[in-house]
Amino acid sequence: MAHHKSAKKRIRQTERRTEVNRARVSRIRTYVKKVELAIAGGDSAAAQAALQEAQPELMKGAQAGILHKNTASRKVSRLVARVKEMKSLA
C-alpha cells in the first residue's frame, strides 16, 4: 500500500484512467461487432453504415492511446475490405 501522498494520488488517477479506457475499449468493440454482424447477415447497406460509425471510433481509440495507430488502421482496412468484398458479391 502506498504511503506517500503522491503515490496515493497516482493510484487514484490510474483507477480513473482504467475506468475510462475500459469504457472506450468496450465502445470500440461494440462498433466493430456491429460491422461484423452486418457482414455475417449479408446486409451491405447496414454493414456500410456500421463501418462509417466504427471507423472514427477506432481512430479515436488510437489517438487516445488505447490502440496502437497501426492496429487501428489495420482493423479499419480489414473491415473495409470485407465490406467491399461483400458488395462485389451481391
UniProtKB/Swiss-Prot annotation:
Keywords: Ribonucleoprotein, Ribosomal protein, RNA-binding, rRNA-binding. Residues 1-11 have a biased composition (Basic residues). GO terms for biological process: translation. The keyword Transmembrane helix does not apply. GO terms for molecular function: small ribosomal subunit rRNA binding; structural constituent of ribosome. Residues 1-22 are annotated as: Disordered. The keyword RNA-binding applies. Pfam families: Ribosomal_S20p. Residues 12-22 have a biased composition (Basic and acidic residues). GO terms for cellular component: small ribosomal subunit. HAMAP family: Ribosomal_bS20 (MF_00500). PANTHER family: 30S RIBOSOMAL PROTEIN S20, SMALL RIBOSOMAL SUBUNIT PROTEIN BS20C. Belongs to the bacterial ribosomal protein bS20 family. Binds directly to 16S ribosomal RNA. This is Small ribosomal subunit protein bS20. It comes from Paramagnetospirillum magneticum (strain ATCC 700264 / AMB-1) (Magnetospirillum magneticum).
